[in-house]
Amino acid sequence: MNIIAIMGPHGVFYKDEPIKELESALVAQGFQIIWPQNSVDLLKFIEHNPRICGVIFDWDEYSLDLCSDINQLNEYLPLYAFINTHSTMDVSVQDMRMALWFFEYALGQAEDIAIRMRQYTDEYLDNITPPFTKALFTYVKERKYTFCTPGHMGGTAYQKSPVGCLFYDFFGGNTLKADVSISVTELGSLLDHTGPHLEAEEYIARTFGAEQSYIVTNGTSTSNKIVGMYAAPSGSTLLIDRNCHKSLAHLLMMNDVVPVWLKPTRNALGILGGIPRREFTRDSIEEKVAATTQAQWPVHAVITNSTYDGLLYNTDWIKQTLDVPSIHFDSAWVPYTHFHPIYQGKSGMSGERVAGKVIFETQSTHKMLAALSQASLIHIKGEYDEEAFNEAFMMHTTTSPSYPIVASVETAAAMLRGNPGKRLINRSVERALHFRKEVQRLREESDGWFFDIWQPPQVDEAECWPVAPGEQWHGFNDADADHMFLDPVKVTILTPGMDEQGNMSEDGIPAALVAKFLDERGIVVEKTGPYNLLFLFSIGIDKTKAMGLLRGLTEFKRSYDLNLRIKNMLPDLYAEDPDFYRNMRIQDLAQGIHKLIRKHDLPGLMLRAFDTLPEMIMTPHQAWQRQIKGEVETIALEQLVGRVSANMILPYPPGVPLLMPGEMLTKESRTVLDFLLMLCSVGQHYPGFETDIHGAKQDEDGVYRVRVLKMAG
């Protein structure tokens, strides 16, 4: 970061000559100099090049107007105003809070001024670097000799082996030097929350609006377990979203608690809806508790916010309404909601404390922000037992945490501070909105069919669009007012074949075909449903990637309309079974899968499968204890009715458990099995379209098998 922008020249000797001298002195200090054409050019440069570290300008020509414009982009950026003896200094106390320094035009002063600008630049970099990351950078630069872990010793060991050299060259020296031991006392301790690690947690809490934050280096799967192990003691009852991540299902297996399920909705497209308001009422919870063996009034509740498909709750209403002392929002997919006004009141940490309640929010920092994989955060607001919570934290945290992951979490937080952070999130929102409008435009201009987007008919402005009652676009029956909202950065593309109400057309294009087409062209889809594809517009998505996706969609339409051979359009799929696909064309494949889906009435089957819950014979914990004692056997998936499942069974997508350990399918819930068998049949008919079902294993004979508990006697 060594770029300084100079506004000029000015066409007068007494101004231009000192600036020329200064340019030479700054180059000698290691700076790179650029000369924007005008203020518009400068602002565009600052907006698109965060490596700039200073701006030099003439005060008489630009004054506070330019400073204010720059501050809207980055209020921390050093600004250097040059004045003469006649300049008017109309600067208020508020203005002096800017990173603004004044220098007089004078010959022979360039070297001293350049040294000062180097100092101010160093202060700027120090100011924007968060505490733990700063300490880690300093430690790496010191190049100390260590006789502790890790064994690669800052990468030295890798360079003693040919293959190790390949590894070292790929990842780079600093990455390996930053992988240090907990024995380095000046970096503090993640487990004891001391030193720079403590400073990092305090810094992150301030940034995200929490009272306390914890850094977790092995994913939100672990963060969820930490919160659950603390908040739901053995023998207690846990109120939990059935639309939960499998890590929470694992928590139920680990912890001897009784789950009481909050049942969410879903529409005919298979898009996950939220939990209706009625489910949060005291009357509804009392009914659930009364109907569940061993259940008591719940001590803790877990809600997935947002859903996988991007639906956010009115969390303020839930926090005030849900009569449970401890509420956990699993917000793995939305770590950015604190940083844009459209998300106000839709996150766990929004608003003030709620009397008598503690609010937890877990976030996968790596999913949508700029952090390394497995980077996660736990945010807390409210009274809690810090010592007991830290025991749960240490129970699930390695004693050799990855310091690069810690630094990446902290840096992700630092990137969101101030105007630069607001701009990052706003750019993602605006880019997603622009993409949505482009798809709409292409659909209107297209000859014949084109893709659609799951959204309200009009999306003129960036907002979280309400899933309002009576509206057709979302496809949810009996939607509640002011309850669920669609996140604009979660973009769901719809393919022809079925509308939001589940009405199927004569012809259709299953989304799996589009996903395979895009994948073979280097575009990876986040989630694929029967007739929809989910794309995430994170802060790392730029215009190039967005246009690449748009181009991929238009290329698919062109290839589909030409009815190309599978061999030419989807060569990787063709390679799965050349004999099967030898003479097949894309429209034949699309209509074949579409007819299979129509035959099984997928929309109705899917709705019924998720609407009727299986019978809980025992808790997931009790079922797990039976399994580790070996009291299990393997049966064909089609024989599952009447047997108690040993594992959770969930098809991906969407990755939501259909069957939990300890649950049994009955005649009333048999549609769960019918739905699973229907998913299996697609892969049996069309090679390359096998469904990934967690908890079910496909053997060489093509039969899916599952583990169930042995029957008594």
Language model region names:
Residues H10-V12, D60-E61, F82-M89, G108-Q109, ...:
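Short beta-alpha junction loops
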Residues Q29, E75, D95-M98, N255-D256, ...:
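Short, structured coil segments at secondary-structure junctions
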Residues M1-I3:
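Extreme N-terminal starter segment of soluble prokaryotic enzymes
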Residues V163-M254, V260:
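Long, structured ligand/cofactor-binding scaffold of large enzymes
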Residues F13-G30, S39-F57, I70, Y76-L77, ...:
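Non-catalytic terminal extensions of PLP-dependent enzymes
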Residues L64-S87, I378-I380:
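A short, gly/pro- and small-residue-rich
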Residues P36-F45, D58, S68, T220-Q440:
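Conserved PLP-enzyme active-site core in the AAT-like
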